[in-house]
Amino acid sequence: MAKVLVLYYSSYGHVETMAQHIVEGAKSVPGVEVTLKRVPETIPVDQARAIGVKVDQAAPVATVDELADYDAIIFGTPTRFGNMAGQMRTFLDQTGGLWMKGALVGKIGSVFASTGTQHGGQETTITSFHTTLLHHGMVIVGVPYACSGLVNMNEITGGTPYGATTLAGADGSRQPSANELDIARYQGKHVAELASKLAS
C-alpha cells in the first residue's frame, strides 16, 4: 500500500483548506493511505494570535524523521516574497540527516501554494521549493494540463502546471475558489496514482 503525506504550513487557513482537498483527492485512489500533517509554528503563540494566525489547526504536527516513512509527500506553503514560508524552510533545514542517508531518494515530491495576489509569486514559490526536493533526490510531480481547471479563463484563479495554488487577496479575505479546490483535488489524486504505481 502506497503512503502519501500532505504536509503544510498555513498562517490564515487558506493552505490548510487546500491541503484538505488534496487529501480528498488522494483518498479517492484505492489502496493508498493518506496522512495530513503540518509543520511547527515558529512564531510564539501569543504573538501569532495577535496578528490573526490560525493557531488551532486540527492536523497534528509532523516530525522530520517521519518523512522517510512515506512514498510521496505533497508540501503546501504560503508565499513569502516568492519563496516558501519561513516555517516550512525551518522544518526542511532540519532534514540534513535524511539527506545524508538518502532517505527520500526516489520518493515523489509535489508542492502547492497560496499567494496574496494574482501575480504574487505562486510559480516561483513552487519552482524554488523544487530545488530542495531535487537535492533530496525526489521525483517532482506537478499538475498536468489534463486538469481542465488550469485553462479556466472565465475567472481570476490560481492553478499552475507546477502545482495547485490559491489567491488569498492582499487582506486574506478571499477563500479558495471551486476551481482552485478542484485543481487541488486533482493534484492529490494524480500524486496518489503515481505513488501507487511506484510502490507496486
From Swiss-Prot:
Mind telling me which Gene3D superfamilies this protein's record contains? 3.40.50.360
Repeat: present as a keyword of the record? no
Enzyme class, top EC level, equals oxidoreductase
Any GO molecular function: FMN binding
Q: Which reaction does it catalyse?
A: a quinone + NADH + H(+) = a quinol + NAD(+); a quinone + NADPH + H(+) = a quinol + NADP(+)
> Where, in this chain's numbering, is FMN bound?
10-15, 79-81, 114-120, 135
Domain Flavodoxin-like: from-to ranges: 4-191
Gene Ontology terms, cellular component aspect? membrane
Stretches assigned to coiled coil:
none
Name one matching Pfam family: FMN_red
Matching entries from PROSITE patterns are given as:
FLAVODOXIN_LIKE (PS50902)
Q: What is this protein called?
A: NAD(P)H dehydrogenase (quinone)
Source organism: Burkholderia orbicola (strain MC0-3)
